[in-house]
Amino acid sequence: MDIINQLAGIEPGGRLDEVRNLRPKAKQNAQATFTALLEPEDTGAFSYAERYAVAAFVAGLFQVPAAAEFYLDLLGDAAADDIVAAVRQATDRGATRGPAHDAGFVTFQDIDGADARLSAAFDFAHLLVFHPQDARPAALGHLEEAGWDADGIVSLAQLIAFLAFQVRVVHGLRVLGGKGDSAGNAAGANEAANVTEGESAGADSTSPGWHVAGDVIVPEVHAPEGFVNHSLGWKPWIPAVAKEDMTPQQIDALIKPERVDSEYFRLLARDPEALRARTETDLDIFYNTDGGMARAERELAATVVSRLNGCAYCASVHQARCVDEGGDREVVDRLLDEGVDTDLGSDYWSAIRNAAVALTRTPSEFTAKHIDAVRAAAPGAAAVSPGTESAGHADAVVIDLINCSSFFNWANRLMLTLGEPDVPRRFR
C-alpha cells in the first residue's frame, strides 16, 4: 500500500498514479521512509506508540484531515485511550500559523496522559512544525533531559520533518486531483484561524527555559548575516558518527561515498534506513529529468521554500544550483536579499514562487488557482486539454513542483533544528 496515494485518494494505475511513477524512486522511497520511521524492525528506545503519537500530533498541527485521521487511527491501534486523548488535547493547544520567527514557544508538560518523554517530543515537534528557525541547542538539551538519546533525537527529527513533506504532497495531490482544498479543517483549525502568524494560542514565551545538557554541543560558528550567494558550512548540535565508527550499513545509507566527510550526513546516519530512503527520494525529485519541470525551476522552488522557512544553509546551496542550471543571477540574488515577495521577472517563476510559498504555509494555502497559474505560464503547457499528452506533461510539472517544495520543508527542518550554518573563513 502506498500511503501517499491512499491519503490523496489516488487510484492505482490512474492518471495521477502514472504521473507519480515518472519519479519512481521518489514514490518508492517516500513509502520506504514511512516504513523506516513508523514501522522499523528495531524501534530502539523510540517506541511504536511514541512514533504514532508524534505523527498524529504533527499531522494534526499541519491540518491536513486525511493525514490527521490516518495517524490517529494508527495510534488508536497501538496505544491506550489516554494517549490518544493527550494527542488531541495537545493538538488543540498547539494550533497556530507558520512559518514564523521569534515566535512564542508552546509547551506541553501538563498534558494529561503524556509522560516527560512524550511531552518533550511534542515541544520539539511544535517548534519544528511552526518556527524551526527559532531552534537553538537548548531544544536538544530539553529532549536529552527528558530521556532522549542522540539516536532517538535524530529519528524524532526525521519523523517530524518527513511528515512536513508527506502531508504537503498529500494536500498538493488532492488539489491536483480535484478533491478540494482539504487543509485547514483538522483539529485546531478554528483556533488557528483566530491566531496571527508567529503567535500561538497558549504560547508561553520566547524563552521556554530549556538548557543545554548531556551530549549537546554549542559549536563555535561565524553565523551568516542573512542569506548569502556563496557556500556555507554546517555544524551539528549533537555528535555525528565519527568516520572511523561508521558501520557498513551507515556508509551504504549515504548513497554517495563522498558524503562521509559531511558531519550532517554522518549525523543523519544515526538512523541509516531513514537516511537512505530520504536520500533516494531527494535524488529522484531533483535529478530525474524524465519529463516534468526543468532543473533550474526545481532549484528555484527549493530556494523559495528555504528563504521562507529561514534556512540560510539550504538557500545557499540551492540558489547556486538554480543559477548553474540557467537561472538569472540577478533575480536569484534579489530573492535572497528581499525575500519571497520580490519581483522574479517572469510569470512562470512568479507562479512557481506563489505555489511554493502557499504549500509551505501552515495551514496550507495551496489551491487550484496555483496549479492553473503554473500550467498557464509553463513553457509549452498553456491551453492543454484533459487526457492529452500535453495535459500529462502539465501534470508532471505540477507534481515536480509539489515534490520539490514539499521536500524542502523536510530538509529545512533538519538543517535548522539539528545544527547551524557556519561561514567559511574565505568568505568572512
Regions found by a protein language model. Name each.
Residues 1-428:
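Hydrophobic alpha-helical segments
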